[in-house]
Design a protein with these regions (language model features):
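Interfacial juxtamembrane loops and adjacent helix segments
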Residues: 233-276
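Alpha-solenoid helical repeat scaffolds
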Residues: 376, 407-411, 440-445, 473-478, ...
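Short coil turns that delineate tetratricopeptide repeat
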Residues: 403-404, 436-437, 470, 504
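Hydrophobic alpha-helical transmembrane segments in integral membrane proteins
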Residues: 197-211, 359-390, 407
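Alpha-helical transmembrane segments of multi-pass inner-membrane proteins
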Residues: 10-29, 36, 40-60, 66-97, ...
Length: 519
């Protein structure tokens, strides 16, 4: 029996809708995201293989209304279950202080998922036949909106306000026929909604708003250094913290000092790719996100379900890092494939296409499985590093595969340091330097140099760590230990005075310990 034309995409939609909401799987060093990425890649690869089989059987028209409706339905269903789980957690444990997360890692991730899926639910609500289905989709939309509010995500609230404006326009246009009254009610409501949203977003977390402004300013300095070609792959990770350190050296009394932390992303996707790859990258990203709108304006009304979802990614890209999560890439991929479906249909006519598709699918499967095995080996080595010297042999075996991964190198150096293999730790942490300039790397490098009695280098690393994050106490403790070991009483007293008078951001047990020790 020939394969049903829509089967590959229906399989992918069902698979992805479940994978995106997976709880943490503790088989890798990143229990939240890595399992989702691996399962998503495997889902795409298997879909490609199924599509190749469909082509071999002469089934070429994959895109149809049934597939689109199925995609919206399965994502609406899984999102509704996720929202119900959030409700269950609230009933059992009460409201979460930092915002609801459900089965995901943080409120921002949950809000992104809800904002992407809400337009799909709305599309089903508008196009469904039958009162019972409309009630079901309406209930799912209301539940998603309530949970989105409970995430306390400011970007999510902006998207929710956007949905409110669009929904209000649909209601006003349908039920109010007098043009002047219609525009009056709509205009006043929109102004009030926008003013309320702006006030909430601006004043809800003032420290966070100030911190974002500071990060954007330092990131823009990186852009101005190499606006055309950028700083290269992962240039932001290499360069940003150095600029932050330079700023606080020049402005030690800055109001931002108490807010500074380890930064690995500027909280703006356009700025991030610009720093790394130059001006062409943000332009390409913007055009990609606007592709459904361009197709819709050219008369392709079948792009309607993707307009708001891609707009959501555009909004999140201005304030967060949505492409850190599989749901963003999935949304872009489906939107782009649907936008170029006619071109894709022409490619399907070529006999070589299913062979290329099958080879590509098998390659993705092989790559994903190989990477997952190595990542699991890293997880095992990390777990063993707390109690077994054999962990260093495991790290050594994994080193050729991960030698360009700065997170692995830091983990390897930390494991070597904990097992008291200082020479190995020093070599590895130095290899990490050209790939990543960060507070934690400098602090670990300082500790390694201190125990190797390389005191001048230890001072350099501790001072760099202190400049990167002036609010932290650990670098000052490191400097205190160095000056104590070298008998430098003058600098020892200066550091002790700094620790005694330093503003405490979070009064943790470590801070209290450092204050007691360094009196």
């Amino acid at each position: 029996m020939p394969m049903k034309t829509s089967m590959p995409y229906q399989f992918l939609a069902a698979w992805m809708s479940v994978v995106c909401y997976l709880p943490p799987i503790y088989l890798f060093t990143d229990a939240h995201l890595l399992p989702k990425w691996y399962l998503c890649l495997l889902g795409v690869a298997v879909t490609g293989a199924l599509a190749a089989v469909a082509l071999w059987h002469g089934r070429q028209n994959w895109w149809d209304g049934e597939t689109l409706s199925f995609v919206c339905k399965v994502f609406t269903l899984t999102t509704a279950f996720e929202c119900l789980w959030v409700v269950v957690c609230i009933v059992r444990e009460g409201l979460r202080q930092g915002g609801e997360v459900g089965t995901l890692d943080n409120p921002a991730e949950l809000s992104l998922h809800l904002c992407v899926v809400l337009p799909m639910t709305g599309w089903l609500l508008v196009h469904s036949e039958g009162r019972s289905w409309r009630l079901a989709y309406g209930a799912a939309a209301v539940l998603s909106a309530v949970v989105l509010w409970l995430t306390q995500s400011r970007t999510g609230l902006i998207c929710l306000a956007l949905y409110g404006i669009i929904g209000l326009w649909l209601v006003v246009r349908r039920y109010i026929h007098r043009k002047l009254l219609r525009w009056g009610i709509y205009g006043v409501t929109v102004v009030v909604l926008l003013a309320g949203t702006s006030a909430y977003v601006t004043f809800r977390k003032t420290d966070s708003t100030s911190g974002r402004s500071f990060i954007l300013s330092r990131s823009w300095e990186l852009v101005k250094e190499h606006p055309i070609i950028g700083h290269g792959h992962r240039g932001f990770e290499r360069e940003y913290m150095l600029r932050q350190a330079d700023f606080f050296r020049e402005h030690p009394d800055s109001e931002y000092a108490v807010l500074a932390d380890e930064i690995r992303h500027p909280l703006n996707e356009f700025l991030y790719v610009w720093v790394n790859y130059g001006v062409a990258a943000p332009v390409a990203l913007l055009l990609l996100l606007l592709l459904p709108l361009w197709r819709w304006l050219r008369g392709d009304r079948k792009m309607s379900p993707f307009l708001l979802s891609m707009t959501v990614l555009l909004v999140f890209s201005c304030f967060s890092y949505p492409f850190y999560y599989p749901i963003a890439w999935l949304t872009v991929g489906v939107s782009v494939l649907y936008a170029v479906r006619r071109t894709l249909h022409c490619w399907q006519q070529r006999k070589v296409f299913p062979y290329l598709l099958s080879v590509l699918s098998l390659t993705v499967i092989a790559f994903t499985m190989n990477d997952a095995l190595h990542e699991h080996g890293w997880y095992r080595a990390y777990r063993h590093s707390f109690r077994e010297d054999s962990a260093l042999m495991e790290y050594e075996d994994l080193y050729p595969y991960f030698r360009r991964n700065h997170v692995f190198l830091y983990s390897y150096a930390m494991a070597s340091f904990k097992r008291k293999d200082l020479d190995r730790a020093k070599v590895v942490i130095d290899e990490c330097g050209p790939l990543w300039s960060g507070y934690n790397r400098e602090l670990l490098a300082g500790d390694i140099c201190y125990y190797m009695e390389e005191y001048p280098d230890a001072i350099t690393h501790y001072e760099m760590a202190q400049a990167m994050c002036p609010v932290r106490f650990a670098p000052l403790e490191g400097l205190y230990k160095v000056y104590d070991a070298t008998g430098d009483t003058l600098h020892l007293k200066e550091i002790a005075a700094q620790i005694a008078t330093k503003q405490v951001k979070v009064n943790s047990s470590d801070v209290m310990r450092i204050k007691r020790r360094c009196r």
